[in-house]
Amino acid sequence: LSTASTREGWWSGALSSRDTDKYGYQGKYYPLHSRIEIRAKIPYIYGIWMGPWCRHYAGASVAELDIEEFFVKEFENTASPRRLSQALHLHDNKTGNLGINVNGYGRHTVLDFDPGADFHTYGVQVDPDPVSPDKHAIISYLLDGKVTNTFKTIDYDDRYNTFITKAIAEGREKRTWDIAITGQIGGKNENGIGYPEDRNANLRNVSMDVDWVRVFTRDETEPEIPEKPEYPVEKFDYSRAVVEKRVFDSKMYWYPI
């Protein structure tokens, strides 16, 4: 899959799992407690704002999980100009409004590579908090399988848990997250984006290449690992029907859905 922004053709575009309802199918949503990952090659260019994110079924005003964003303008003149932003926006029960960037400055990760040069895996995982699984969650962001930052709703009492309690009360635990992939050219300067012509007046085509999007849920059943074939040795991968290999703890395994 390749989503491309062409200046003469259009300025922005998006793919959304919930939009399957426009083609004769039920809108597609994914479980509240799940791990969502995307492997993609995403351009790091001034004025280009592309990225995958998750929206709560009741709207982004309840919860938005930004799996990847690049704000090139914001960091271009800093000591670490190349950074990944993985922001968390959750309804704030104290103010009655959407809480922006509730995971604070820790949402930024310094990159030592060009994300537009090769594929990397960006992800978010939402786990029930074992202390209070019906009211609270632990949200972890990931880059290439490693956790970049973690947010625990219980640390703020019941201030940021509407996305959990609402889904459970309305029976939507299995159908909570809409997965969207946005391609966009330009954004407000105050948002740290700017416009590409401010740096490159000749920029015309920008592509974000997506290898895959995968969603996993947990199960305590230990998987049966298939025998590794003699050939091809280097290209061998576990079947999607078996299990995603990473393990969260000793007795919980991620299974693809």
Model-derived segments and spans:
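GH16 jelly-roll
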Residues: 1-238
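Extracellular/luminal Pro/Thr/Ser-rich low-complexity repeat and linker "mucin-like" segments
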Residues: 238-257
